[in-house]
A protein has these predicted regions:
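PLP-dependent amino-acid enzyme catalytic core
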Residues: 32-367
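Intrinsically disordered, low-complexity serine/threonine-rich segments
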Residues: 13-18, 47
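Residue-level detector of intrinsically disordered terminal segments
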Residues: 11-12, 32
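Short linear motifs in low-complexity or flexible loops
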Residues: 3-4, 15
């Protein structure tokens, strides 16, 4: 059993931004955005029969350790193991129902977006081609093919794969499905907030991982609509803080995408999502690799929940920045659980070694 506070590491990366304590303005006073709370509500009505209404569970022991009340939304329990089911479901459903439906869909992804698109394409009877980087682990390729998609390996990065996916889409009369910078994707991801705040209306603070920003943008739209004083914090890693730089108008620092939280290591944030987050998010908090590793370990040991690095980033931020949240009712989205088993084993073993719970003995015995 972990002792109180033992998973808090280092000093704080930063304090809350200047807007964190300011009263939220009414959405009607802000410049128009490409997605609205009404869009999120309509998305929920459209997809709720085709996705999992995932549970939002209280974690009283962890909350007590941190001086707050804590709820965890288990998007790890979606059909494909992540929140990506939501946006993919809405986008593909609209494409399939359009007057001129495409011959199929194409996407570029090395992870959860690939599986979300593949799953819902098969459900809707659409052909799906997923372009993955050449370095994609075989386990991810196998899972995506197992959901009925054609996998094409092309490019050294997701950015290069995206170029090829768009070319394939044009050649085959397919629709290209962007992982986050699409109003329908944002609206679909935002349905997680409808469930979460309906299930636990006491929540007054949301902590949400941010890669391209689709999940955080969609959830912020609904949360601020329901309660303008609800705080919304995004979370990125210190190795890849692209969205934080974008919404602050700061130079984008050198990005490192080789991180345990690779699902949110996005170099190019969305235009649609950045505009929403710039207006609605209270701050974007940073976490480091040890924070993320420890969050994965604590969630597995104490909550019996397996989260991938990106999925655990929100909880990592709550532990690192607990002083910002003390006394509040905090909802954290565990946005994905698709972690490679070997990686999970490595992370758990490192945690046991760090906590002094594994010892190596070397015994020399005379023959």
């Amino acid at each position: 059993h972990e002792a109180p506070g033992q998973f808090e590491h280092g000093r704080m990366m930063r304090t809350a931004g200047p807007c964190s304590n300011a009263p939220a303005r009414s959405l009607r006073c802000r410049p128009a955005m490409q997605v609205t709370a009404h869009d999120v509500q309509q998305a929920h009505a459209a997809i709720k029969s085709h996705i999992q209404h995932t549970p939002t569970i209280e974690a009283p022991r962890l909350g007590e350790m941190l001086g707050l009340r804590l709820w965890l939304k288990l998007e790890t329990m979606q059909f494909t193991g992540s929140f990506k089911d939501r946006g993919s479901c809405l986008k593909l459903q609209r494409l399939a129902q359009s007057a001129n439906p495409p011959a199929g869909v194409a996407a570029a992804s090395a992870g959860n977006h690939a599986q979300g698109v593949a799953y819902h394409a098969r459900r809707l009877g659409l052909k799906a081609t997923i372009v993955m980087p050449l370095t994609t682990p075989f386990s991810k390729i196998e899972r995506t093919e197992g959901l009925g998609a054609e996998v094409v390996l092309r490019g050294e990065s997701v950015a290069e794969s995206t170029v090829h996916a768009k070319e394939l889409a044009a050649q085959r009369n397919y629709a290209f499905v962007h992982p986050y910078d699409d109003p329908l994707i944002v609206a679909g991801q935002g349905t997680a907030a409808i469930e979460m705040l309906a299930d636990q209306p006491a929540i007054d603070t949301l902590v949400i991982p941010v890669g391209g920003g689709g999940l955080c943008a969609g959830m912020a739209l609904w949360a601020k609509h329901v309660n303008p004083n609800c705080r919304v914090y995004g979370v990125q890693t210190a190795m890849c803080p692209s969205m934080r730089a974008a919404i602050r108008g700061e130079p984008v620092p050198a990005m490192h995408t080789h991180t345990l939280a690779d699902g949110i290591a996005v170099k190019t944030p969305g235009v649609v999502t950045a505009e929403i987050l710039k207006q609605l998010v209270d701050d974007i908090l940073l976490v480091d690799e040890v924070d993320v590793e420890t969050a994965v370990q604590v969630l597995a040991a104490q909550q019996k929940v397996v989260a991938e690095g990106a999925g655990a980033a929100g909880f990592a931020a709550v532990t690192r920045h607990a002083h910002l949240l003390r006394g509040r009712n905090v909802g954290v989205v565990l946005c994905g659980g698709n972690i490679d088993r070997r990686m999970l084993a490595t992370v758990l073993l490192r945690g046991l070694k760090r906590d002094g719970k594994i010892a190596k003995l070397r015994i020399a015995i005379h023959d």
